[in-house]
Amino acid sequence: MAACVPEKQTVPTVPPELRKLNGRQYQLESSSAALMPLILQGTTNNFGANISKISMEFSPGECRLIVEDGAETNLIVAGMDGTPRKGCVTLNGEIYAVGSTARLTTDEDDRPVLKVFICFTETPSVRIMKFILYSPERMLIRFDELPSVEASLEVLFSLVGGRREPEQPE
């Protein structure tokens, strides 16, 4: 009779690159990005303030972002284990359900990059925040969204007035 040995389970840990950022707060020098994706702001007529400050906290399997924009502060809890964490964000007094994940990767220059995906679960919109880590004191944040503004406008134009043909140079 063969002995049945349980699989060894790995316990999630906080990656060393992120431990250096634990508890840090970052003031954004100049930002034109809001927590809510632009296309969602337009469809809900709820235009949020620009993000001014972000704090980061990490625990095994989770990333916590405290995002300040205008008068509101939102806590985003993102699963780093592949499982989204459910939560809510408040923008101009309106509450939106979100599910968030995060993962640590590297860019083409081998710098650590923390990607956070904030899915607005009642819509098709996703805010993507890429934190490119230069040092514990300095990082670049890139904001993206799905669907992209370009793709959303293309769909809108096709619904409203037919498909637009690209302009031909004269």
What do the predicted segments below correspond to?
Residues 98:
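Residues that flank catalytic or metal-binding motifs in active/ligand-binding sites
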Residues 1-95, 106, 119-138, 142-158, ...:
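Catalytic loop of the DD-peptidase/beta-lactamase superfamily, centered on the K-T-G motif
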